[in-house]
From Swiss-Prot:
Protein name: ATP phosphoribosyltransferase
Reaction(s) catalysed by this chain's protein: 1-(5-phospho-beta-D-ribosyl)-ATP + diphosphate = 5-phospho-alpha-D-ribose 1-diphosphate + ATP
Domains as described in the record: Lacks the C-terminal regulatory region which is replaced by HisZ.
UniProt lineage: Bacteria, Pseudomonadati, Pseudomonadota, Gammaproteobacteria, Pseudomonadales
Subcellular location, record wording: Cytoplasm
Source organism of this protein record: Pseudomonas syringae pv. syringae (strain B728a)
EC number: 2.4.2.17
Length: 211
């Protein structure tokens, strides 16, 4: 049995057509089904529907053989039991700092609100900047508006939400897209099967990119 971990939303919607190229099609609509384990048209392949931030955990610990996760999630994840063989070039966005429009950056310690705590620590450590990291799980845009933080680090797509709340994108930390991740033990035990799937997905990605 080959188990693939996916999260609902944009990543799932963009991944399903790629899996279809490999003949893997869910037997139920994952967006409408309440099931978290979904069979596919290949009897020995199933999909796990999990939270986006949990995909690497399921894969590293062998609950799933493969998964699809955003590079932002993988940058924040601290585990080591994963291969990242393929950039699927889907769900593209940017991981950026943002702050109030026209605000002057403080000269002392910077207060940064984010759910990407590990990313923030590495980013500012590389700059030699002293910062206080404030972990939030959502509504990041509020933090600078009410004085909780000087800046935020968050995923930015169009930037419209930032601008609607009086903020502006500032420094680019990373360009994000979704990646295929593979459990290291699964890659050894089911190498031929998984490598064939990787090769098929790579061809599908390249074909899309050319068109």
């Amino acid at each position: 049995m080959l188990t693939i971990a996916l999260s609902k939303g944009r990543i799932l919607d963009d991944t399903l057509p790629l899996l279809a190229e490999a003949g893997i099609v869910p037997t139920e609509n994952p967006d409408k089904s309440r099931k978290l384990i979904i069979p596919t048209t290949q009897a020995d392949v199933r999909l796990l529907i999990v939270r986006a931030t949990d995909v690497p955990t399921y894969v590293e610990h062998g609950a799933a053989d493969l998964g699809v996760a955003g590079k932002d999630v993988l940058m924040e994840y601290t585990g080591q039991g994963l291969y990242e063989p393929l950039d699927l070039q889907i769900a593209k966005c940017r991981l950026m700092t943002a702050g109030a429009i026209g605000a002057v950056e403080p000269k002392g310690r910077l207060r940064v609100a984010t759910k990407f705590v590990n990313v923030a620590k590495r980013y500012y450590a590389e700059q030699g900047r002293q910062v206080d990291i404030i972990k939030l799980y959502g509504s990041m845009e509020l933090a600078p508006l009410i004085g909780l933080a000087d800046k935020i680090i968050d995923v930015v797509d169009t930037g419209n939400t930032l601008r609607a709340n009086g903020l502006e994108p500032q420094e680019l930390i990373a360009t994000i897209s979704s990646r295929l991740v593979v459990n290291k033990a699964s890659m050894k035990m089911q190498h031929a099967r998984i490598q064939a799937l990787i090769d098929t997905l790579r061809k599908a990605v390249e074909s899309r990119h050319r068109s």
